[in-house]
Amino acid sequence: MPRKTPIERYRNIGISAHIDAGKTTTTERILFYTGVSHKIGEVHDGAATMDWMEQEQERGITITSAATTAFWKGMAGNYPEHRINIIDTPGHVDFTIEVERSMRVLDGACMVYDSVGGVQPQSETVWRQANKYKVPRIAFVNKMDRIGADFFRVQKQIGERLKGVAVPIQIPIGAEDHFQGVVDLVKMKAIVWDDESQGVKFTYEDIPANLAELAHEWREKMVEAAAEASEELLEKYLHDHESLTEDEIKAALRKRTIANEIVPMLCGSAFKNKGVQAMLDAVIDYLPSPADVPAILGHDLHDKEAERHPNDEDPFSSLAFKIMTDPFVGQLIFFRVYSGVVESGDTVLNATKDKKERLGRILQMHANERKEIKEVRAGDIAAAVGLKEATTGDTLCDPAHPIVLERMIFPEPVISQAVEPKTKADQEKMGLALNRLAQEDPSFRVQTDEESGQTIISGMGELHLEILVDRMKREFGVEATVGKPQVAYRETVRTPAKDVEGKFVKQSGGRGQYGHAVITLEPNPGKGYEFVDAIKGGVIPREYIPSVDKGIQETLKSGVLAGYPVVDVKVTLTFGSYHDVDSNENAFRMAGSMAFKEAMRRAKPVLLEPMMAVEVETPEDFMGNVMGDLSSRRGIVQGMEDIAGGGGKLVRAEVPLAEMFGYSTSLRSATQGRATYTMEFKQYAETPANVSEGVISAKVK
C-alpha cells in the first residue's frame, strides 16, 4: 500500500503549556478547523475531546497525553494536504513525566502562553525538557482577549526567563475586549477573523494606520533574524532591507527554528476563535517534518552504535511512549515509528526486553475515538493492541535488524502512601489495578512493606497519587483507604570506612558454610551505587565475587539508621578468604551483607530527605506571611522577583518535602486564597540532626 502523505508533509507536534494557559481549548480549535470535530468542545463545560478521562473533565486539567491525527491544507487552502499528529501534554507539575515522555517522540512543539500570566514556573520546566530533547518550537500567546493581555511582555519574558530568542511573526491588533486579529509581518497584511463562522472565514486587510509604525519596526526585527540564516541572505539584506522575498523569509526562519536558534511567535484567542489557523500554518511553515530531523541513534544487541533514517526503506524501528488501559480493547500501546513500515499481524521484536511479539490491531486515535488501519510508516504515531510485554520506553523493531533506541530515564518517586482495600473483595482487584496503573506510568511504583505487610504506593506528588487512587475506584471499581503521605527518605554515608570484614561461618559437622569478605566503603555523591573488585591473587575465587556484590545490593534496600534505601556509596572488595569445601555463593552473599552493615555503621551514616523547588506567586501585601511560613517550614528562600504586569511577587525557595504536606491549605488561609504555588523535586539533601532523630525514632518504634 503506497504512502498517502509524503513524509515531508508530516508534522509530529506537542502542544505544551502551563495550567490554564488554554492548551486544551487550543487543541480543540485545531481539531475543529481541521474538520475532525464538528462542535467545538469547551473545557469550561468539561466536554473537550482531548481530555478523555473522567477526572480530567472534573478538574479541568489535562492528564494523559492523547495522540490525535488531523489534516490541514492551510488557512487559505494554499498548501498541499499535510498530516499533523498532535500529542496533547499535561501542564501540571505532578505530571512532568508525561510531558517528558511525549517530548521524546515529538519533532516540534507549540508552546502556549497566557497573555496575562506569561511565562510561569511550569513553562520553565517544559522548556527545559524541550531543550533536553532539542525540540524546535513556536510560541502562541493565547487569551489576547483577557484584561491585562500584553503580547510584547511575554516576548520579553521568553528571553529573560527561558533564554529563548522569540521572534514575533505577527503582532496583535488591539487587546482585551478590542482584540480583533493580527498583523502578519511576513505578508504585511492584517488578518481579521469572522465571528459568525466561529472564525472559519477571515479576510486580509490593510494594516490599521495606528499600527503601521509598530508593524514596520517588528517586521524589521523579523527580517533581520531571518537574514542571519546564511551569509548570502545577510549580504542581500544588508544591501537592501526590503529585498528578501516572502519565500526567502519563510525558508530562513524555518531553517533557524529547526536549528533551535529562534522561536517564531504568534498570538490569538482560541476561545474567541482567533489566530489558531494561522498557528497551524506556522506549524507547517516552521516546524520540522520527520525528514528534517537527524537520523535516530541507538545500539544493536551487541551494544554497537546503529542508526535509523526517517524513511520507509530502512528497517522498522519505533518507540513505545505511552500505555493506556482502554475499557473496550484492553491495553493500548502508543508508539512512534522512526523508520520502515509495519503491518498489523507482523511479528516485531521488543529489543529492550529481547522478546518477540505479534502486533495485533493498529489503531489511529482521534482523542478517544479510533480508526483501525492496516499499516504504519516512518513518521506515524499510532496505538497497538495485543502487545503483552511492552512498557513505556521500549523499542519495537524489525526482528531481522534489532536496535535499542535510547532508554527514557524516569525520575524516582518522592512521596509514598499506604493503601488498604476497604473490603476482602477489593483485595485481589486492588493488586491487579495497581499493577495496571504502574505499567502505564513509570513514575508510579507499588511495593509491599515487608514488616507491616501494607501495600505502599509512591509517586511524584500528592495530586499524582490522589488521581491514581481515584482511577482505581472509577476504572477498576476498587475502594481503598489511603494512609498519611510519607516522605521517601534515603540513607548514605559521610566518611570512608576502611577494611571492614564480614565473616559468615557455620561449621558443625557435615557440609558447612564459609564466606569471608573485607570491604572499604566510601561516599559516592550523586553517582549511585558502585562496586569495585580489587581482589588480588585469588584470595576469593572469581565465581564468588558477584555473590558479595549481590549480598551488598540486597542490604542497600534497608539502611542501618531507619531501614531506608541506601544511595550514593562506593564499595571496594579488597580482601577475604575461602574454604575449599564449605564456601559457596550463599555464604559469600551473607559475608558481603554483614560487611556492608558493619561498614555503614562506622562510616557516619546520615539521613537524606527530598528537597523541593517551590515557587509561590503572591500579591505583595501577603509577602511577609508567605516568607514567614516558608521559613517556619525549614525553607531557604533563594530569590524574589516582581511578576511582570504589576501582579505581585514570585518567591523561589527550596523546602524539604516533609514540611510541605497540607501547604496548599495554609497558603490559602495566609493569603485569603490569592496566592498559587508549584512544587517539583529538586534533589536529596542531608537532614538536620534534630529532624533525623525524630524520623529515626518514629521508624524504629
UniProtKB/Swiss-Prot annotation:
Tell me the SMART domains matching this sequence.
EFG_C, EFG_IV
Q: Which UniProt keywords apply?
A: Cytoplasm, Elongation factor, GTP-binding, Nucleotide-binding, Protein biosynthesis
Recorded hits in Gene3D superfamilies, A to Z, give: 3.30.230.10, 3.30.70.240, Elongation Factor G (Translational Gtpase), domain 3, P-loop containing nucleotide triphosphate hydrolases, Translation factors
InterPro entries given in the database record: EFG_II, EFG_III, EFG_III/V, EFG_IV, EFG_V, EFG_V-like, EFTu-like_2, G_TR_CS
Q: Where is the tr-type G domain?
A: 8-291
Q: Where's it found, cell-wise?
A: Cytoplasm
Q: Where does GTP bind?
A: 17-24, 88-92, 142-145
Instruction: Using the UniProt record, give the first listed, main subcellular location.
Output: cytoplasm
A GO biological process held by the record: ribosome disassembly
- Family recorded in the similarity comment: Belongs to the TRAFAC class translation factor GTPase superfamily. Classic translation factor GTPase family. EF-G/EF-2 subfamily.
Q: What does this protein do?
A: Catalyzes the GTP-dependent ribosomal translocation step during translation elongation. During this step, the ribosome changes from the pre-translocational (PRE) to the post-translocational (POST) state as the newly formed A-site-bound peptidyl-tRNA and P-site-bound deacylated tRNA move to the P and E sites, respectively. Catalyzes the coordinated movement of the two tRNA molecules, the mRNA and conformational changes in the ribosome.
- List the protein's name: Elongation factor G 2
- Biological classification of the source: Bacteria, Pseudomonadati, Pseudomonadota, Betaproteobacteria, Burkholderiales
Identify the coding gene.
Answer: fusA2
